[in-house]
Amino acid sequence: MKRLLAAALALLAPPLSAQEEAALPPAESARTMVVLQTTAGDITVALETERAPITAGNFLRYVDEDRFDGMVFYRAMKLDWGDQPNGLIQGGTQWDPDRVLPGIPHEPTTVTGLSHTKGALSMAMGEPGTANGDFSIFLQDSTGMDADPKSEDPVWRNGYAVFGYVTDGMEVVQAIHAMPTDPDKGEGWMKGQMMAQPVKIVEARRLEPAASD
């Protein structure tokens, strides 16, 4: 099942109502808020800058250098099992040579203590150490993507790197996920997962903390 999930989720990537947002990890840690302004609406995310400093820091570099501006959500993978809607949306630079930065060291969930729960932001990658400017947002719990130290498969020992969670705008994520895909777009097992009309990320910006009185 894990291998099937890998083929479905990799790039190369308790039930909640549609209006509920993803729950952040219970323990307090430093987070940086970012809003992704898309043509479908705004998605606000909390980046785990303390728990996943390398991965969250990489995402913030793309934000601060305007590298996501004008990029798109281009993939909507729809899974027909589990709570619905299920799957992910994926966006980012698509390896645009004018936007993409070098790959970053991998931060497994066994180190960060994070998990692929509903609303998780996770880096797309071919193998550990290759993640750069493409990321996924999960519509349901997908903890099978977390690192599994007992696995004999090196891919699953490392898992995928979670670095943040949606805190507002999950309905926008679901709306993007529900948009039509093109049956002729994509290659291999990803054929049919590419969106017929990608959704533009107009801009990505940090949200500054509200000033206290």
Show where each model-derived region lies.
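A periodicity- and composition-biased signal for non-globular, repetitive helical segments
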Residues: 8-9, 96
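Hydrophobic h-region of N-terminal signal peptides that target proteins for export
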Residues: 9-17
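Bacterial N-terminal signal peptides that target proteins for export
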Residues: 1-5
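Intrinsically disordered, low-complexity segments enriched in polar/charged small residues
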Residues: 7-8, 202
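Cyclophilin-like peptidyl-prolyl cis-trans isomerases
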Residues: 16-213
